[in-house]
């Protein structure tokens, strides 16, 4: 393995990076799918948990934390309810993982070729590469993200019986723009998130690797630390994105039937602040961090292992 900042950007051929990134995303997604459904349900819940009077006229369930929400979904919708939206989410993670790692590798290699007066410090180089990879990956795969949210927000009332039905319905009633509701919040969120994630990951990986943790868990630990730091900073934009993704003609048919009508990132943020205060912007943060830590750990651990296997296979083929 390369040391320091050379680690992610120069190991493996392009097809190996694409394959490793895609497999890492797929494995990670399946492992954390139930927590993702819980997070989305909590983010779309607009009533205050501390004010029982706000529950009086609501239409839909009242979720009060990660464990109770998991139990409620399992009780009301069965085990499959915890994996709602998993098909578009798997497609999202596969394509996003492949695009993200490929773009990161390409950008960092390009930056590394700059002459000495223009070379960026290692943390800045990782930040720029991570932000670019995140922005491009988010925009190109955003329709899958929107579909994942809408399926996860469904209760027993099947708004979209299948993925193909959902695509046809959104295109027919909302047009092509319907697939990109909230995309500005997503890009605004993911650019600093991925920049912070990769910069932190590259910074802490070397010190952690010197601890010689078992089973290659140094990469996983670095991924956890990087994810928690980055996720907390940009979480309000993630909540705004989810609220915007369920706008449109089906807004009142999701599990939370009282979702307000939102228009634009700033106005949505103002409405959330007005109705729930600063805490309203961080609804679902706890489960998001619980999800983000294992998701990032599994992603980075799987990526490193798969890439290593592919390189070994390639070496054996050459010999």
From Swiss-Prot:
Q: Which InterPro entries match?
A: Mit_carrier (IPR002067), Mitochondrial_sb/sol_carrier (IPR018108), Mt_carrier_dom_sf (IPR023395)
User: Which Gene3D superfamilies does the record match to this protein?
Assistant: Mitochondrial carrier domain
* Per-repeat ranges for Solcar: 12-110, 121-207, 214-309
Any idea where this protein resides?
Answer: Mitochondrion inner membrane
- Primary location group: mitochondrion
Alphabetical list of Pfam families matching this protein: Mito_carr (PF00153)
Q: What residue intervals traverse the membrane?
A: 17-35, 91-107, 127-147, 182-201, 221-237, 284-301
Could you state one GO cellular component term attached to this entry?
mitochondrial inner membrane
- Alphabetically ordered keywords of this record: Membrane, Mitochondrion, Mitochondrion inner membrane, Repeat, Transmembrane, Transmembrane helix, Transport
Query: In Gene Ontology terms, what is a biological process of this protein?
Result: transmembrane transport
Q: How does it sit in the membrane?
A: Multi-pass membrane protein
Q: Which SUPFAM superfamilies match?
A: Mitochondrial carrier (SSF103506)
Is this entry keyworded Ubl conjugation? no
Q: Write out the function statement from the record.
A: Mitochondrial transporter that mediates uptake of thiamine pyrophosphate (ThPP) into mitochondria.
**Protein family (similarity comment):** Belongs to the mitochondrial carrier (TC 2.A.29) family.
From the Swiss-Prot or TrEMBL record, give the protein name: Mitochondrial thiamine pyrophosphate carrier 1
Q: Which gene encodes it?
A: TPC1
């Amino acid at each position: 393995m390369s040391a320091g900042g050379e680690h992610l950007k120069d190991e493996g051929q392009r097809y190996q990076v694409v394959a490793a990134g895609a497999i890492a995303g797929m494995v990670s997604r399946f492992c954390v799918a139930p927590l993702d459904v819980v997070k989305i349900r909590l983010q779309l819940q607009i009533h205050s948990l501390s004010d029982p009077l706000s529950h009086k006229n609501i239409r839909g369930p009242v979720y009060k934390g990660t464990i109770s929400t998991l139990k409620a979904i399992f009780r009301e919708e069965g085990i499959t309810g915890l994996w709602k939206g998993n098909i578009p989410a798997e497609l999202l993670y596969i394509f996003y993982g492949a695009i993200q790692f490929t773009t990161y590798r390409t950008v960092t290699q390009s930056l590394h070729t700059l002459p000495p007066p223009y070379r960026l410090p290692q943390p800045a180089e990782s930040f720029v590469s991570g932000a670019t990879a995140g922005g491009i990956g988010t925009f190109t795969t955003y329709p899958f993200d929107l579909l994942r949210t809408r399926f996860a927000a469904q209760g027993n009332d099947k708004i979209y019986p299948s993925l193909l039905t959902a695509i046809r319905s959104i295109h027919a009633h909302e047009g092509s723009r319907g697939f990109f509701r909230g995309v500005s919040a997503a890009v605004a969120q993911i650019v600093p998130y991925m920049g912070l994630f990769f910069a932190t990951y590259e910074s802490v990986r070397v010190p952690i690797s010197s601890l010689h943790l078992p089973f290659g868990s140094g990469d996983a630990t670095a991924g956890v630390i990087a994810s928690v730091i980055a996720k907390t900073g940009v979480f309000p934009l993630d909540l705004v994105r989810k609220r915007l993704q369920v706008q449109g003609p089906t807004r009142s048919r999701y599990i939370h039937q009282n979702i307000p009508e939102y228009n634009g990132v700033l106005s949505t943020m103002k409405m959330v602040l007005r109705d729930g205060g600063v805490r309203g912007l961080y609804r679902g943060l706890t489960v998001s961090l619980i999800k983000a830590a294992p998701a990032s750990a599994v992603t980075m651990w799987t990526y490193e292992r798969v890439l290593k296997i592919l390189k070994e296979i390639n070496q054996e083929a050459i010999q």
